[in-house]
Amino acid sequence: MNDTLKVLETRRSCRNFKPDMIPEETLEQIVRAGTYAPTGMGKQSPIILAVTNKELRDQFSEENRKIMGAPVGMDPFYGAPVILVVLANKAVPTHVYDGSLVMGNLMNAAESLGVASIWIHRAKEEFESDFGKKILADLGIQGEYEGIGHCRSEERRVGKEC
């Protein structure tokens, strides 16, 4: 079986991450793969935010927890040190599909590099909130962007654990 098919058949979601940061070069390779996802009409509208700052990561976690309605102290990101947020421009008719393909590329690229991941939802609601709008404004991102999801990653553990 070729390596691509093996990745597609073996990738699974991880719900127990180590706090160790993945190497920057590995993260860059994963993000780069996300930018090569196919998009409708070749618009390439999705944006990938790599959240590596622990304070900001924890703010995302708290916002996501509130939207989820989970108890205080629960981490919807399962302790992952990196969050990759995918946003897609609402002005593009295929924005949800485009962002979803980016998420798939991110998770499959992570798997191919031995990095665990999981798709976490509620990004749409996060970026419709004041919290999300402020993040976009602070980053200078203009336009109507919808959060598609979060890909959380870390180096995969040996054996059945991720």
What residues fall within each predicted segment?
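Acidic, surface-exposed loops and disordered segments
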Residues: M1-K160
